[in-house]
């Protein structure tokens, strides 16, 4: 009887909360608004369209919402609040600054609220609903055509448009109430679930876990916001990635890299993303082809796998606490998911490899621990595909395979002698299936084009496509500044001490954005460096005090793998191209997190928890303070 009473009370409280939220939404309705301007022709260059919309009566700088025009379409979205007869949309700047490439023509303007079209204006209606300031000169034609005569052209909504914009719409209201209510409910359930996971912990543990949850959710929100709004040209090599992704909109098989069909995918280096085995471009292309927004087309896949990674971290917030250290130690991890780069898929696969190692009941650990069962056939296949993606990744992620090899070897050597044989056979099966799948894929997708000489073809094509300073045949002294330092006579000591190698490497690991142009103040990197040293020192100290030989061997394996990671970066910068980029260091997060997972009762270690709290807060601050202001086009300057 008491249980029934409690259940009834819960339903009453839930109904009361829903009714209260309904009343609040009647006064102030959450509205996700999208304004779409379609130009008759794609404006020349990187043109930014800005909508000024906000709660105030007058226009302010904070009202700016901007997007780059892609393929003749500017699609600007923001979270709005509808109340009374207030019209939040105050003006539209069709271009960000002076435009001297001729007249511009807008064919249509559409306004969606919560996904529902509420305004759709064609050419003849646009003139009725919008006027221009003195820096917009309209033509006398029947089209909405105008010339830009100054640096601040503005389209101003008329009173008729404002009335149209503020009209009520029942479906918009209901969707705003329902979706926002569900999001609040989801957040409340997440908080409740986290508190249940740590119900036996101290107040410090409970508060920090809620902070970690906020950090993960905050990272997801900022990454999504940046991905949907940042221009392609602000991110490293994204136009080259875009060309490779768009190819797979209409193709399943990789192209012959000598084909003219992929000419647009070659940068000055003469290397195309189609040279790679990486499946990122295929996955992103096959998903993106169903969407019309240019940013969504090539970035949605990265956002999905980032969301999956965040979900796995939250789900394991206590059980596999070490996963938090991969996610919250540096905002550089978040950044590679906010634009389109194959590093995102490589990192995600490395993250799954770490999960397979530290999760007691993972596919890998069950296959290695249990006697053969039929479901293990599926496990072998999925694990081989996982490892295969690391084979297809950038060379800097090969250390993940090296790390897996060392850890599994150490585990085998610490088994009883009679257990080593069966375990070794399982290792061979996994390695054999992985290599077999690699060979099958090559024979299907590459052998018909190149035989066994793909590397030779790559070198020939690079020679043909690269600009002079980047051609392999160009004399070293005439090569581009960053190329072939070794051949230019620069010693290893000079490379490491006279070119800010370590400074750039660390800063771009701890948080640097754009084409490595936007960084924090010096104090940020100093504090992060100290926190990383404390983290490493505390982890090694705890493991060493546990006095288990296997842990000491694992520390040695991690140290050696990290050293190889460093050597790969140094070698590339010395022999190929000077690129001390922190994204090449990101795999060490997996190795450090593995060691943290081996610490006894790591959940209760206040030092490690405090360090993670600090890096979480600093990472959020860095991405919000430097990343977003420089990666979205509201404040950035055109190149």
Where are these regions (language model features)?
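Transmembrane-helix motifs of polytopic, lipid-linked glycan transferases
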Residues: 189, 297-320, 352, 537
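Transmembrane-helix signature of polytopic, membrane-embedded enzymes
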Residues: 209-212, 296, 313-334
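Start-transfer (signal-anchor) and selected internal transmembrane alpha helices
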Residues: 1-30, 169-225, 413, 424-434, ...
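Membrane-lumen/periplasm interface segments of specific transmembrane helices
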Residues: 406, 410, 423-535, 623-629
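Perimembrane helix-loop-helix junctions
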Residues: 356-370, 400-435
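Membrane-interface anchor segments at the N-terminal boundary of transmembrane helices
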Residues: 166-178, 290-304, 493-566
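Loop-to-helix entry region of an early transmembrane alpha helix in multi-pass inner-membrane enzymes
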Residues: 270-308
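Transmembrane signal-anchor helices characteristic of membrane glycosylation enzymes that use polyprenol
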Residues: 17-30, 206-238, 247-253, 431-448, ...
